[in-house]
Structure formats: structure tokens, C-alpha cells
């Protein structure tokens, strides 16, 4: 089948290892097959091409974590990318993100940037008819991560407030949209004036990084890392929560522990989300009329262009692949 896959590892020039062509990857025969209609790119794909989380001994590896498509029974489905346990098994109601043996698609098992993807049947979530395949394909990684950060780890209260650091990328943009949909007062930072305008259009109040906010917030969504972490601590109210799911600009952050203990702040890690949380996210999108922010929809034949766009960093929202063209 035709797929976009990592054929080599290159930390300095990740796109040098991207190959588009025919491949016949091995997956467990008992898993469900999904004919992919749309997929979406994530920075995880670039990190894989750099060799982070993907060793040379696992090459070639089909890339991609996000997909929506049709299973062998004709059902329209969204693929949950977290594969739990040593054999991909996951029990109902179990938080598979806490499984020490968990992997994401494209780390141990072939990913979604292909004509077909196989996953445990547990990983299939019904796609609501209100969402297009392109919209649904945006949700399983970045949007699910943002949902868990806000609702589960951050425990965002009704009528609460949230700061999103470094808005513009997939997770941060999702956090802005979801925070607004949840009824929160949303503040977001970006160095780019154009992105600040687009953040404001989504319903948030935009600031330059490091700016003083009108209030201290219940929840801070932190993915930038070292350059913004002190600001995140200063912006959290007493008993507030700083939820971290990335450190794109540096992972060695200085922390004023006096602020942490005196204000009884919580610093919480968050990674992806469960199948049940993905189902809840889909329901929220339908009930609140929420739709993912899509930067560009490329045809699958343009996958190299899509990756180049992702690497450039000049993206606001998700990059989507339409597998019909």
C-alpha cells in the first residue's frame, strides 16, 4: 500500500528520511483495519524522523498518529492513537496513558499516513456524522491532548480562567478553542502579531509573551517550556494548576519553589488522552458546534509539501491530508 514512512533517521535534516511509496508493514492480523480517508500531521512525526522515540531498528516505519476513515464493516470511525499493553490490549475504563508499556502509533506499530491502518478494535471510536473526515482527523492527538489538559488534569472549573502559552500550534490552538467552548475566560500568548489577531478571533484575549494578565488564572497550559515557565507560575492563582505537555523551547526551567508552596500551586504532567476522553471530545465538538482550526488541507500526493510546512513552523492550527487525492 502507499504510505509516508521514515526510511532513515536524521536529527539535523529530518525530511531527508521521509519516503513516500509502497510498503507492506506487519501488524497483528486480529486487529481492525481502517481505510483512511483523512489524516493529520503532528510534531511527533518530525521528532520520529529525528529518531526521538523511534530507533533505526524499527525502520521503515509508517508515520502518523491521527486518522479518520471507514472500518471493514463500513463504520465511519476515528482512530485513537494510544496503543496500550504489550499486545495493544486495553481494558474498558483503564487509563492507557498511564500504562508503562504504552506506545503511540508510528513508534512500535505502523501509523496512519497510509491507505490503511490496523489498530486494536478498542481503539476505534465512532465518528459523529456532524464532523467531516478532515475535521475528525485533527482530534486524536493535539485536540485530545488539549482536552485532557483542560478538563482532566487541569480540572478547569465552570466559569474559570486559563492561560495558553505559545498559541498557534495544534495543541495550543485547540486549548484556546476548547477553553472558550467550556465557558472559560481564555488568555493566550504569542510572539507573532498575526497569530495574536487570529487568537483573538477565536475568542481569547491575546498578549505578548511575559505580559501581565488582568487576573491570575485557574489553569495554565504550558508547552513552551523554559522561556515561559516562570511567567506561567506568576500567572497562576492560589491553588492554581500549571499543566505541562511539552517543552518545545527548552526543558531545563528554573522554578521559584517559594511561589509553588506558598500559593499551593500544582505542576502537573499530561500526555495524550484515553479512548473515553476522545469520545467525550467528539461529543463536545458536536454539542457545542466546535470545529478544529485547520491551517491547510493537502492532498496525500502533497505529503512532502505538508511536512515542509510543518517543519517551517509557519502554521496556525492543523495540517490535514485528504487521502482521496
Indicate where each model-derived feature is located.
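C-terminal hydrophobic helical "lid"/dimerization subdomain
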Residues: 1, 275-325
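Short, surface-exposed secondary-structure boundary micro-motifs
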Residues: 37-38, 72, 82-83, 122, ...
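Glycine-rich beta-strand-centered segment in the early N-terminal region that forms part
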Residues: 24-40, 52-93, 97, 101, ...
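Mid-domain Rossmann-like dinucleotide-binding core that forms the NAD(H)/NADP(H) cofactor-binding site
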Residues: 129, 135-210
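Short acidic low-complexity segments
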Residues: 26, 71-72, 206-214, 302
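NAD(P)H dinucleotide-binding glycine-rich loop of Rossmann-like/cofactor-binding domains
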Residues: 81-166
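Glycine-rich cofactor phosphate-binding loops and adjacent beta1-alpha1 units
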Residues: 185-187, 193, 197-266
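Rossmann-fold dehydrogenase core element
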Residues: 238-243, 254-296
Amino acid at each position: 500500500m502507499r504510505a509516508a514512512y521514515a526510511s532513515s533517521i536524521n536529527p539535523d535534516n529530518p525530511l531527508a528520511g521521509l519516503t513516500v511509496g509502497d510498503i507492506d508493514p506487519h501488524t497483528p492480523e486480529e486487529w481492525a483495519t481502517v481505510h483512511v480517508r483523512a489524516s493529520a500531521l503532528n510534531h511527533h512525526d518530525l521528532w520520529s524522523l529525528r529518531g526521538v522515540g523511534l530507533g533505526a531498528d524499527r525502520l521503515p516505519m509508517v508515520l502518523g498518529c491521527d486518522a479518520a476513515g471507514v472500518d471493514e464493516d463500513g463504520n465511519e470511525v476515528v482512530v485513537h492513537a494510544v496503543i496500550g499493553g504489550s499486545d495493544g490490549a486495553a481494558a474498558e475504563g483503564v487509563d492507557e496513558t498511564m500504562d508503562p508499556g504504552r506506545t503511540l502509533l508510528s513508534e512500535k506499530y505502523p501509523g496512519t499516513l497510509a491507505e490503511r491502518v490496523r489498530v486494536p478494535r478498542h481503539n476505534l471510536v465512532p465518528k459523529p456524522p456532524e464532523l467531516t473526515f478532515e475535521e475528525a482527523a485533527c482530534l486524536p492527538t493535539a485536540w485530545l491532548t488539549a482536552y485532557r489538559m483542560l478538563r482532566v488534569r487541569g480540572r478547569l472549573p465552570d466559569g474559570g480562567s486559563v492561560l495558553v502559552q505559545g498559541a498557534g500550534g495544534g495543541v495550543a490552538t485547540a486549548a484556546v478553542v476548547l477553553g472558550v467552548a467550556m465557558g472559560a475566560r481564555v488568555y493566550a500568548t504569542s510572539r507573532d502579531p498575526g497569530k495574536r489577531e487570529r487568537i483573538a478571533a477565536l475568542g481569547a484575549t491575546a498578549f505578548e509573551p511575559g505580559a501581565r494578565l488582568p487576573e491570575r488564572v485557574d489553569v495554565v497550559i504550558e508547552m513552551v517550556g523554559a522561556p515561559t515557565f516562570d511567567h506561567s507560575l506568576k500567572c497562576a492563582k492560589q491553588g492554581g494548576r500549571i499543566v505541562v505537555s511539552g517543552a518545545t523551547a527548552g526543558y531545563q526551567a528554573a522554578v521559584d519553589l517559594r511561589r509553588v508552596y506558598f500559593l499551593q500551586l500544582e505542576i502537573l504532567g499530561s500526555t495524550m488522552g484515553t479512548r473515553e476522553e476522545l469520545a467525550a471530545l467528539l461529543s463536545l465538538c458536536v454539542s457545542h458546534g466546535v470545529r478544529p482550526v485547520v491551517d491547510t488541507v493537502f492532498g496525500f500526493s502533497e505529503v512532502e509539501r505538508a511536512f515542509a510546512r510543518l517543519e517551517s513552523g509557519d502554521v496556525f492550527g492543523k495540517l490535514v491530508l485528504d487521502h482521496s487525492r
